[in-house]
Amino acid sequence: MLLIPISSSSSSSISPPPNSYPSNHHSLFFSNLTFPIQHGSRKLKTLRLRANFWESIRSGFVKNNNSTQLVEPPSIVNDEEEETEPLLPVEFTLVERNLEDGLVEEIIFSSGGEIDVYDLQGLCDKVGWPRRPLVKLAAALKNSYMVATLHSVMKSSSDSDSSEGGDGEKQQEKKLIGMARATSDHAFNATIWDVLVDPEYQGQGLGKALVEKLVRALLQRDIGNISLFADSQVVDFYQNLGFEADPEGIKGMFWYPK
């Protein structure tokens, strides 16, 4: 399963079938230590992000007499120091713009909620991905640690004016235009998959915003090791977002039937 990153300087890229991995496929790891985040319900320390890549992975293990034992790492924060500040909003408006005919379009980012698999399949069709069984798509979404989406919501300007006055806001159309998801062990590591943006909305920086918001949400949950896979032509795109190829000589590897 490959990624389709979209940025203002990149065109649509099409991934090969999910069961094929070309030789120009790269593993990237998030390593930008200055990436801005808002702290969530726990106080995060920068030591974990400054550690070598494998140090945080090995932090919960210790070797003793040729055996590996699981040990409990020290708590990163005392109970009395815990913050109650909430995590990033589950849903917020990323872009709002006025269109012709008195319409207003909002691009809404969400790090939660459900996705209609038929909408996702339609989005995959638009970017040229091969179709995958709907049952497997639903299972992939269900088993993901986090699913981030971009929706376009179209409404009339009169609806916006009435909502400001306290009346109910009537949404005329809501369309899935972007998605990215992450799998995780819920403690140390996360991998980002399936980054895609509707071709009609490419070239506007929405893919960059989608990845940045997803990374922030993962960091807020104290997930420090974030990786993804990218085709060679979009490695620079992810490196500009703080990802690093082959940190400390570590390479991602794949197994697939001959």
From Swiss-Prot:
The keyword Kinase does not apply. Residues 107-194 are annotated as: Interaction with begomoviruses NSP protein. PROSITE patterns: GNAT (PS51186). InterPro entries: Acyl_CoA_acyltransferase, GNAT_dom, NSI-like. One of its GO terms (molecular function) is protein N-terminal-methionine acetyltransferase activity. Residues 1-58 form a transit peptide. PANTHER family: ACYL-COA N-ACYLTRANSFERASE, GCN5-RELATED N-ACETYLTRANSFERASE 2, CHLOROPLASTIC. The keyword Metal-binding does not apply. Its EC number is 2.3.1.255, 2.3.1.48, 2.3.1.87. Protein acetyltransferase with dual specificity triggering both N-alpha-acetylation (NTA), with a preference for alanine, serine, threonine, methionine and to a lower extent valine as substrates (can also use glycine and leucine), and epsilon-lysine acetylation (KA) of several plastid proteins. Triggers lysine acetylation in KEA1 and KEA2. Acetylates in vitro histones H2A and H3. Does not act as a transcriptional activator but required for the dynamic reorganization of thylakoid protein complexes and grana during photosynthetic state transitions. (Microbial infection) Required for begomovirus infection and systemic spread. In case of begomoviruses infection, acetylates the capsid protein (CP), but not the nuclear shuttle protein (NSP). Stimulates melatonin-triggered defense responses to the necrotrophic Botrytis cinerea. This is GCN5-related N-acetyltransferase 2, chloroplastic. It comes from Arabidopsis thaliana (Mouse-ear cress). The active site is at residue 238. GO terms for cellular component: chloroplast; nucleus. It is found in: Plastid, Chloroplast. Residues 107-258 form the N-acetyltransferase domain. Lacks the bromodomain involved in binding of other acetyltransferases to histones.
